[in-house]
Structures are given as C-alpha cells and as structure tokens.
Regions:
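N-terminal onset of structured domains
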Residues: 1-151, 158-199
Length: 199
C-alpha cells in the first residue's frame, strides 16, 4: 500500500478508469488497422509515420525532460535545465523569487523515445513549513517518439497567479513529478521558491 507521502506525487485517480489494453510496440501501432481512416488520423496526431526516429539506443529512458521554464509578462523567462542526469539535485538550494500576485505560465520541453508515451502528467506538490498548501496537476498528453521532423515537444501550462498578501509571502518547497498513465515516474525533483513583495 502506498503511503500518503507517495500519493502526493501521483495524479488523482479517476474512479473506475483503467487502461484498456497492454502497451503495444511502435511497429504494432504503425501496422494496426491500416485501412481505418480515423485511426490513421489519430496515429498521425501522435506523430507516427513521419520522419526519422531519434531514439537513442544507449539511453533506456522513455521520457527525457529537457527543461521547465517560468514565463511572466515583462520579465525574462527563468529556465530550469533538466537535460543532464542529476541536473535537478541542486534546485532545492537555489530558490526562485516570484512577486506576489504575479501572473506566470510554466512551459515544459521534453523528448520521447523508444515507445509511445501515454497520458503524461505534471504533478506539483507545494509545502510551506512542512504543511502541504497545494497539489496541482496538468495533463500534458500522449506522444510518439520524437523524429527529425519533431525533435522536441513543448507544452505550455495554464496561466497561474502567485499568491499575494503578507501571509502568503515567504519560502515554499515544491516537488515536481512527471508521471504517465502507468504511474511510471519519468522525473521527480525538489525545488523551492520565495513569494516576495517585489521581483
């Protein structure tokens, strides 16, 4: 049984939902129902059937998160480079500064290789002084392995407002997780931010 702490980093489950069939290989997807026009459109929307596969045979990861960027109007973007293994290990000690009440948007850049990635989600749990203050998730979608015609995927999240007011100001710790429909965690990292009166 998973602990409450483990569930903090997984998306909320939809009661009664389960994957309808086991994973299939890329070749099986590409050859499936070749005469079904709607399925061909669906496969094309996933990126199947076009371009040279860029999967690295020496890297077994299916989803490689390249970066996470925070954009806020009138400010230069702040990017967390996650492209190298272990790059995320120092983020907790280097807090971001966010102005209270500021509008911001997060943007994730990532690569997919070897197989279709189904139901990728971003889950973020934020704590202040050890108490969870929020848990949010954003569905990123399903993706085929990257090709030379689509070398990287970029997903822009919904715009958010930073909390405001004297009580909201202070230091926060966050855990961000990229997880798929199979509950496989592709990346999890801790980071921190400070809500302040000014940038």
């Amino acid at each position: 049984m998973a602990s409450h702490e483990d569930n903090d980093h997984l998306p909320e489950e939809t009661q009664g939902y389960k994957l309808s069939q086991p994973k299939q290989s890329l070749a099986e997807y590409q050859n499936m129902d070749a005469n079904d026009e709607s399925l061909q459109r669906y496969k094309k929307s996933l990126g199947l059937g076009g371009g040279k596969d860029l999967s690295d045979p020496n890297d077994s990861r299916v989803c490689i998160i390249q970066s996470l960027t925070m954009e806020s109007p009138g400010r230069p973007p702040v990017t967390i480079d996650l492209s190298q293994p272990g790059a995320e290990s120092t983020l907790k000690d280097k807090p971001f500064k966010i102005k209270e009440g500021a509008k911001f948007t997060m943007v994730a850049s990532f690569r997919v290789q070897h197989e279709i990635l189904s139901g990728l989600q971003y889950v973020q749990t934020v704590k202040r002084k050890g108490i969870r203050v929020s848990k949010d998730s954003e569905m990123l979608g399903s993706y085929a392995p990257n090709t030379d015609s689509q070398p990287i995927y970029t997903k822009r999240f919904q715009e958010e407002d930073a909390p405001s007011g004297m009580i909201a100001r202070g230091h926060y710790n966050a855990v961000s997780t990229f997880v798929d429909d199979d509950k496989k965690q592709h990346l999890q990292f801790e980071w921190s931010f400070d809500i302040s009166k000014d940038w």
